Amino acid sequence: MAAHATSEPAVNLPATQFESQVTEPFGVTLLVRHLPDGIPHDIVSRLFSQYGASAVRPCSGGKLRNAAFVDFKNEAFASQAHRQLNGLRFLGKVLQVQRANKPNDNKKSRQIEESVTKGNAFSTVSTNNDSKSGQILSGEPIAPKLGIDYPFPPHLQYAYPPPDANILANITNALIAVPPLYTQVLHLMNKMNLPPPFRLALPTPPLPKAGPQQTDLEHQSSSESEMESDEDIGTSKSGRKRARHGFLVGLGMDKDVPHETVGVKPSSLTPKEIPRIRKNKHVMQIKITSKVTQDEYKEESENEDPADEPKEKDSNLKPFASLEELEKGRLPPQDILSLPMFKNYTAGNPSVVLYIKNLAKDVVIDDFYYIFGSQFESSEVAKSSLGVRLMQEGRMRGQAFLTFPSVEVAHRALNLVNGFVFKGKPMIIQFGRTPGAAKPNE
């Protein structure tokens, strides 16, 4: 009978026939399958010791590869461990637990287990069965001193709400206040193969919209005027479609592809309306005046001061654009990042020369004095201090070099005018590489 048991292949034995080598001290043995590949024995032992295991015997080959026999002292520990470990996800694997022994003949069970041990090269690893594991399994309270007298639920799962502006703002504040949390977030981004955040700010993906928010948007769109209804309805529909497909950049995205090419719609973290580029709408006003007789017209013409006419003309002709006009004419930062012409934009090293491109075809030299004149005391000082070199032919057409009297003035002008829409095209301004690239205009 013993020779027949040792010659029988170990893989053909059902799992329910395995019993512990020493039934009296161990009591109950469980067979745990689907362990992670290549996991060390000490990690397996520490894992099962938390559930009250007294000994762990991993298997190394055959049908019981990635499996282990776990011994328990009594039926209570084994039943609780079977209930908690079965279906547990451990390092990407779902554990499968079943009983490995039943009250059969001890002699037969020992012969079967010895044959399996020889065929699969079992290695027995004993663990320390201290009092802590028994206390945890028996339901130790979480914090009795604080009034929490119930044990920690083993099957607790969390259901987090979707992100919104307040949640993201609180997370940002926590990252600033707790430096270890910031380091752990960077570690997690590295493990998930996300693009590194050490660069300029990228467009923010749209936040998921809830049901009440969509109804509010529909109510707002219905209350708008008839002249803007077509455009607003088109933008709202496109916004909903993009929000439906707009996901955060994750594992499925190539790391070499920049975010700008993905087509993520820029949005703001603060709960406000979607920013739109303001369009100047020209409204034609027709004034209808009553007919005036010749005598009345003469009296009015005599009362008018002839010196008022040149004053009105002078008030309409401004020597240079004001700071408010430049600020209103600039594109918002989120719109600048979304334009392909600003892809990989860098300001460069500060110098007295500004390199400007993406200019309209009908731009002339006087336009630069009008745009940058606010940096000088008067238009005469601007024409004498600002050197302009406008390229109007060849491959450099639509580009210009401006020479300022100092680096501070050039830096202030770049921050003020970069992205300013002039004659239908946004200006792209960078620092020039060589100070001698631009010469004063004679």
From Swiss-Prot:
It is found in: Nucleus. Residues 200-209 have a biased composition (Pro residues). Residues 102-116 have a biased composition (Basic and acidic residues). The keyword Repeat applies. One of its GO terms (molecular function) is pre-mRNA intronic binding. Residues 28-102, 352-434 form the RRM domain. GO terms for biological process: inflorescence development; mRNA splicing, via spliceosome. Keywords: mRNA processing, mRNA splicing, Nucleus, Repeat, Ribonucleoprotein, RNA-binding, Spliceosome. Its main location: nucleus. It comes from the Eukaryota. GO terms for cellular component: nucleus; U12-type spliceosomal complex. Residues 297-307 have a biased composition (Acidic residues). Coiled coil: none annotated. Disruption phenotype: Lethal when homozygous. Residues 117-136 have a biased composition (Polar residues). The keyword Disulfide bond does not apply. Component of minor spliceosome required for U12-type intron splicing and alternative splicing of many introns. Binds specifically to U12 snRNA, which is necessary for branch-point site recognition. Required for normal plant development. Component of the U11/U12 snRNPs that are part of the U12-type spliceosome. Forms a complex with U12 snRNA. This is U11/U12 small nuclear ribonucleoprotein 65 kDa protein. It comes from Arabidopsis thaliana (Mouse-ear cress).
